[in-house]
Amino acid sequence: EEVIHEALGNDVAFVPYYRPGFMLSKIVQQCSDKYAVVLEHHGLVTWGNTHEESYLKTIELEKKAQEYIKNHKTKKDTTSHHKLQTDQIEKLLLRLRGQLSLNQKQIITIDENQLNLANRNDVIQIATGGRSTLEHILRIGKDSLVISEGDDCKETIQSVQEAYKKYFNKYLEKLPAGFDMHVNINPKVGLIPGVGCFGAGISLKEAKRNTEIAKHTHEGAANV
């Protein structure tokens, strides 16, 4: 909240996370005397007498946010990782795809534009730094996988799966008796030093979409 006010001004309200619904709508309505409102894990809400006025507010506040990030961005801390050779990448992706496809065939795509992020010393913090929105969590999971060239993938992926099971079951216990829910515990995205970001999905379209979503959330975590 402090950062929001510092970046956008005190006339922009901040609302802690609420699930979408009537209560959240009521809270936003109570902020009508403010210039705009930022909803935690949802985004920016603006208004005006015309759609153009509301749109211009959005552009204005986005520029303020970008300027704040630019002025407060930490220096990128890259490692000495070099881009892997084609044969090294192919072998790694074959191991990765094989492990992810044990229950259902997966397609894997690579986003080389995230190579600088994957090569940073704090890559673990970037991968586990949280998602930008709840939709991102639903699409690509809570955390990204981090995997190295020499990894056989099996142990790394199994440890991530077990951790996600524990995380999921902790909240499943709070649901009504008899409630059942199945969830895909496979990592959907990950950062690979020397390669970039991988995205996995049952189709090439889904795999590419996952890397695009991951780019937003990884860049956000890197700028914190």
Predicted regions and their residues:
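Glycine-rich flexible loops
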Residues: 1-224
